């Protein structure tokens, strides 16, 4: 295991002092020079520690007064520490979790993995050496860091999964109603006359949330007596094994262009493609456009998430909206219930809804 940097050691010591009640919400923290002397470290180290605490929304600064611990000072007793580990890119998860925490004498340090298993691993290794009460995690890979997550459970630290879980882990999961959302968007395409409907997944080895979306796609076609066709299922290759963001982007780009090449070679190409998320939908629309295939005139494309990329350019993407805020709130509530030894359900579904825009149209076959 890697040696912990000095600023992280100071950070974790301050977290322990918060947890044990030695520092209370509203308390003024010692100044930079006091902390330098206390921990025998440089000013740069203390500033990095303060930046980390501030980035986790644990402290706030008052001009000409000092730095204070965030939260409501009327709470009594030791504060709970429940870190949130997320890929990043969707701030609603963190803001919602922190809103719940401020009402429950709890602190939520936020760690972003940038969707990289290696960075997620670094955060988990650090947290295993910290005195925390529970962990909420949105995993960025399907099973890559299962050894570390099992370490939390072995230490009797509750783990709550957000959006997607790990196979074999008996931990609560807070996720969107992915199956319902994908089913409804496929039904919308069928109502518009489409029967040749393809599916674009991130990977053949799907996350649990993506498995549910794919299940909704398959079951809806079967329900409407539309045959499933192997050649209509597309995915990128080995995305779960890519270590860097550059490698991920390259793999995505190759996969989208290969999908378009496969499309052009088909005797009976699909008239619509359901994508597992909005980023895939937007990239696929771009790849189709490079080949002279227009959306929605030549092909309909749908997404999932209702992220900013869905409306970033024409055509705006018909998609399934998730309530990221509700998911963040519920995940933190479940973690708090586990800390209090309350019984909780294993799966908590958050409702989804269809957002109709420009990227699909009616056809006649």
Map each language-model feature to its residues.
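N-terminal helix-turn-helix DNA-binding module of bacterial transcription factors
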Residues: 1-76
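Flexible loop/turn connectors
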Residues: 13, 253, 257-365
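Short acidic capping loops at alpha-helix termini that bridge into adjacent secondary structure
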Residues: 25-26, 195-196, 228-232, 294-300
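Periplasmic-binding protein-like
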Residues: 83-84, 132-139, 160, 198-201, ...
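Hydrophobic alpha-helical segments within soluble ligand-binding/sensing domains
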Residues: 172-200, 215-219, 252-261, 322-340
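An alpha-beta-alpha
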Residues: 185-227, 347-359
């Amino acid at each position: 295991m890697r040696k912990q940097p000095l600023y992280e050691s100071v950070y974790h010591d301050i977290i322990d002092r918060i947890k044990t009640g030695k520092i209370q919400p509203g308390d003024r923290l010692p100044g930079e020079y006091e902390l330098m002397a206390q921990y025998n470290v440089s000013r740069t180290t203390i500033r990095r520690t303060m930046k980390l605490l501030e980035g986790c929304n644990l402290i706030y600064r008052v001009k000409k007064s000092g730095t204070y611990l965030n939260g409501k000072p009327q709470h009594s007793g030791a504060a709970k520490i429940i870190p949130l580990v997320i890929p990043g890119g969707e701030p609603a998860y963190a803001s919602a979790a922190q809103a719940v925490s401020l009402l429950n004498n709890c602190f939520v340090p936020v760690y972003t993995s940038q969707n990289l298993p290696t960075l997620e691993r670094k955060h988990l290794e650090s947290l295993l050496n910290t005195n925390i009460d529970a962990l909420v995690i949105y995993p960025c890979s399907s099973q890559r860091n299962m050894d570390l997550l099992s370490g939390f459970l072995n230490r009797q630290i509750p783990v709550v999964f957000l959006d997607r879980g790990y196979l074999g882990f008996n931990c609560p999961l807070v996720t969107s109603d992915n199956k319902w959302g994908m089913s409804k968007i496929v039904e919308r395409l069928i109502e518009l006359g489409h029967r040749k409907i393809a599916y674009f997944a991130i990977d053949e080895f799907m996350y649990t949330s993506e498995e549910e979306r794919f299940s909704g796609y398959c079951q809806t076609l079967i329900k409407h007596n539309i045959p499933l066709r192997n050649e209509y299922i597309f995915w990128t290759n080995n995305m779960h094994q890519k270590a860097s963001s550059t490698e991920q982007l390259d793999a995505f780009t190759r996969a989208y262009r290969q999908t378009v090449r496969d499309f052009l070679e088909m005797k009976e190409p699909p008239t619509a493609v359901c994508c597992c998320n909005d980023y895939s939908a937007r990239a696929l629309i771009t790849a189709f456009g490079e080949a002279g295939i227009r959306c929605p005139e030549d092909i309909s494309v749908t997404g999932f998430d209702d992220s900013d990329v869905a409306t970033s350019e024409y055509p705006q993407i018909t998609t399934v909206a998730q309530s990221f805020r509700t998911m963040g709130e519920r995940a933190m509530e479940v973690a708090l219930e586990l800390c209090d030894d309350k019984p909780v359900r294993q799966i908590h579904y958050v409702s989804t809804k269809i957002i109709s825009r420009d990227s699909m149209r009616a056809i006649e076959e």
